[in-house]
Amino acid sequence: MWLQHLSLKTFRNYKETKIDFNPKLNVFLGRNAQGKTNMLEAIYFLALTRSHRTRTDKNLIHFDEEQLHLSGLVQKKTGSIPLEIELTQKGRVTKVNHLKQARLSDYVGHMNVVLFAPEDLQLIKGAPSIRRKFIDMELGQIKPIYLSDLTNYNHILKQRNTYLKSDQKIDETFLSVLDDQLVDYGCRVMNHRLDFIKKLESFGRKKHFELSNQIEELSISYQSSVNITDKQNLSESFKIALEKSRSRDLFKKNTGVGPHRDDISFYINGMDASFGSQGQHRSLVLSIKLAEIELMESITTESPILLLDDVMSELDNTRQLKLLETISQSIQTFITTTSLDHLQNLPENLSIFTIQDGKASVNGN
């Protein structure tokens, strides 16, 4: 798949911009704070209805406006798909083929993206919430039912936590009813995640072995607050975990076990990767990103769109060549950079957009 056209209206520092893209490689060139990353963020937001940089949607709206509008035309094997997002103070409206979508799971997945940014190193050494968000964003694109199950789980979780925080006397029977619902959707979420991690590890192991000159083996482990060793009895394991945690939950007034507490760990040759070197972290994250591309292709039969935010200057020549090798394989790619000197051995079929003060001009024109 590839993004043929993007229209931005009052998004970040872009007042109004319309831009046509190259189906292969697109480079956003400019000084810092001109809007290069904002352009990538717009593409990411159009795909996922979420920003990778802020949790507050109103930060995306141009400072002197009250709403924003993004639209794009995605080309896929099955044909063209127009996508639209309008964001106002009241919320967001999403459209596919000009038809309003009622649920997030009906919208996400029409345009798949893989983002690689310097902050992705936090995937290895950052907080568990960063890794959970990574799973949610990537898995949600290739399996829309996951977003539906996750939304339902979070809804029940919020209900349960609100009830635990209430001043009224706790009805343990009602709490058990909430627990049953939490177990139902929680097991669905965990099963989706376990399947995803297994496939990601399979693709990632091969990529990392190549990147490390056949000396490092990557493995990924899903760390759960629930006993996940027996998937057939996952529901029973979750119920037991909730029962054991009930006195703790009543005291702390929140839910202590479940997929909202889970994490993933990365290992290199059996050792915790978080203790590895900066170079190992870069290689590991690059391996994961390259694995994501292959995983998405294997499930959707479409290549995702690759977004590279100022990462080429962070990679040595070996890692750059490996990444460029992937780019050359019919994957639409967007790169931000302050200098073309950071980009070596680029393919010939590319478009360069100069970004200055929230305006984009192709090839400097």
From Swiss-Prot:
Q: Which PROSITE patterns does this entry report, sorted A to Z?
A: RECF_1 (PS00617), RECF_2 (PS00618)
Q: Which GO terms describe its biological process?
A: DNA replication; DNA synthesis involved in DNA repair; double-strand break repair; SOS response
**SUPFAM superfamilies documented for this protein:** P-loop containing nucleoside triphosphate hydrolases (SSF52540)
**Assigned keywords, A-Z:** ATP-binding, Cytoplasm, DNA damage, DNA repair, DNA replication, DNA-binding, Nucleotide-binding, SOS response
Q: Mind naming one GO cellular-component term on file for this protein? A: cytoplasm
Where is this gene product found?
Answer: Cytoplasm
| Domain of life according to the entry | Bacteria
**Binding residues for ATP, per the UniProt record?**
G30, R31, N32, A33, Q34, G35, K36, T37
- Coarse class of the primary localization is cytoplasm
**CDD domains in the cross-refs:** ABC_RecF
Q: Which GO terms describe its molecular function?
A: ATP binding; single-stranded DNA binding
**Family (UniProt):** Belongs to the RecF family.
What's its job?
A: The RecF protein is involved in DNA metabolism; it is required for DNA replication and normal SOS inducibility. RecF binds preferentially to single-stranded, linear DNA. It also seems to bind ATP.
What is this protein's name? Answer: DNA replication and repair protein RecF
